Curated annotation (Swiss-Prot):
It comes from Petrotoga mobilis (strain DSM 10674 / SJ95). The lineage of its organism: Bacteria, Thermotogati, Thermotogota, Thermotogae, Petrotogales. Belongs to the adenylate kinase family. Consists of three domains, a large central CORE domain and two small peripheral domains, NMPbind and LID, which undergo movements during catalysis. The LID domain closes over the site of phosphoryl transfer upon ATP binding. Assembling and dissambling the active center during each catalytic cycle provides an effective means to prevent ATP hydrolysis. Some bacteria have evolved a zinc-coordinating structure that stabilizes the LID domain. Keywords: ATP-binding, Cytoplasm, Kinase, Metal-binding, Nucleotide biosynthesis, Nucleotide-binding, Transferase, Zinc. Zn(2+) binds at residues 127, 130, 147, 150. This is Adenylate kinase. The gene is adk.
Amino acid sequence: MRLLFFGPPGAGKGTQAKKVAQEFQIVHISTGDILRDAVSKGTELGKMAKAIMDRGELVSDEIMNSLVKERLEELDSFILDGYPRTLDQAKFLDQATKELQKEIDAAVLIDVSEEEIVKRISNRRVCPNCGKVYNLITLQPKEDEKCDVCGTKLIQRDDDKEEVVRERYKVYKKNTEPVIEYYRKNNKIITIDGAQNVEDVTKELFNILRSFNKQ
């Protein structure tokens, strides 16, 4: 099985991708993994990517595309998480997987509304001392706003503030919507309601992929 995973920040996309990888024994790779792997191996592309990142710049589509293709050459089954992010990357991936005869079977969309994402992320609290993460709705501390482990007052990270979350969601929709539409037109999209609890999302996803795998 060759899968792509999409979903807004806070949808639990990474969690579900890892669960699927484990259940179906597929390699789960993220763009971060691909970059780190190429840099540590010291490949030509890895050296180019490292030089760009060392300057604090973003790795170009061209280099990222080549790195992804290089990694996919080594694998038969895979889950790609965090790629493609743009329509150009999606078109490149289509072409590359056709050449490698490893075409994408499905693109999984963990779909969650903006309001649900805001509710999830803006209610996160973190202990600045020991790093334990809480949620004021789903994983409350025993004592109000205090860490169960060390008693330190919990904080809200800047990234978890409502206005930042809404901006990230807006950027996600703007960049990813055309990519999702591209796969929808090609009948590759599997949409899962990500507003369910984690276990129910996993169960639904496993059931769909099991029947899909038998085809």
